[in-house]
């Protein structure tokens, strides 16, 4: 979203989690009245925000050391959606997010997702080569045009669809949306290519939750590498201990030692 608005010439303010090359960091102060903020639900921090527009990508069993149950997370997201004044753009393909949106009124509710029953959805997804993915962006059955991404993974196709929906809601043209997404090369520690040694490519990714790990590994294994090795460092012991036991599909795994706790 930040990349799209910046490319479209909006002098926005931004406060995001990863370092974004186009703004030379994770934040900037602009002259317009538009600000993008990557909100976090941990300890209900995002309930201190009162956004005009909220984008809900998904809801998963995360931060269980604070919330205790997924139901409590869903309730927190419901409260966040209620705090939003104009529009909530949410993942209509995610059951937990849909549950959080039940009973939300007084604002426009717009869905994005994997299938045609959502307002915005991708069609004809093609993984061209390496990090490049093409798809057609659809809006309520109508094709808006082609999107070209230079970031890996099916999850980023949905992220791009959500960003496009939000940008067009605030008046950005499809042409500027497509241009901004084509110029997006990822953020720091989000499948970030660090370099190459011989035939080995080193990628750094912040993923430490099972769903994030699965998405990242699927993206890596869809690329033309002969073998994928995952070196995993739990984020913190307390948080990792609260996560459910899951099986991750990865060819090779080396467990990294956590030094934070």
Language-model features: locations:
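Short internal beta-strands
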Residues: 87-92, 229-232, 255-261
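Short, flexible loop/turn motifs enriched in small residues
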Residues: 48-49, 127-131
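Nucleotide phosphate-binding/pyrophosphate-handling subdomain across enzymes
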Residues: 53, 130-131, 135, 139-256
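Well-ordered beta-strand scaffold positions
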Residues: 32-34, 40, 125, 140-142, ...
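Beta-strand->loop->alpha-helix junctions that form or flank phosphate-binding loops
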Residues: 14-18, 92, 106-129, 148-154, ...
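Generic structural signal for helix capping and beta-alpha/helix-loop junctions
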Residues: 22-23, 97-98, 119, 184, ...
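A structural signal for short hydrophobic beta-strand segments in well-ordered beta-sheet cores
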Residues: 27, 122-125, 191-194
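Phosphate-binding loop of NTP-binding sites
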Residues: 1-92, 96-108, 161, 168-170, ...
């Amino acid at each position: 979203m930040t990349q799209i608005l910046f490319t479209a010439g909006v002098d926005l303010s931004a406060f995001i989690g990863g370092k974004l090359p186009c703004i030379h960091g994770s934040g900037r102060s602009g002259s317009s009245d538009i600000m993008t903020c990557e909100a976090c639900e941990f300890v209900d921090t995002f309930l201190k925000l009162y956004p005009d527009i909220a984008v809900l990508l998904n809801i998963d069993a995360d931060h269980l050391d604070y919330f205790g149950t997924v139901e409590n997370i869903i309730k927190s997201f419901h409260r966040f959606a209620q705090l939003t004044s104009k529009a909530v753009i949410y993942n209509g393909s995610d059951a937990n997010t849909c549950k959080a949106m039940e009973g939300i009124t007084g604002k426009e509710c717009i869905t994005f997702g994997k299938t045609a029953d959502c307002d915005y959805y991708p069609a004809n997804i093609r993984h061209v080569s390496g990090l490049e993915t093409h798809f057609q962006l659809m809006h309520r059955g109508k094709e808006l045009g082609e999107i070209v991404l230079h970031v890996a993974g099916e999850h980023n196709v949905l992220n791009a669809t959500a960003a496009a929906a939000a940008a067009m809601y605030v008046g950005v043209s499809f042409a500027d949306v497509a241009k901004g997404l084509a110029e997006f090369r990822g953020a720091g520690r989000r499948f970030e290519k660090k370099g190459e040694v011989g035939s080995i490519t080193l990628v750094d990714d912040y993923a430490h939750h099972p769903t994030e790990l699965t998405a990242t590994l699927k993206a890596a294994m869809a690329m033309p590498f002969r073998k994928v090795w995952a070196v995993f460092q739990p984020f913190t012991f307390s948080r990792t201990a609260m996560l459910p036991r899951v099986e991750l599909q990865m060819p090779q795994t080396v467990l990294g030692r956590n030094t934070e706790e």
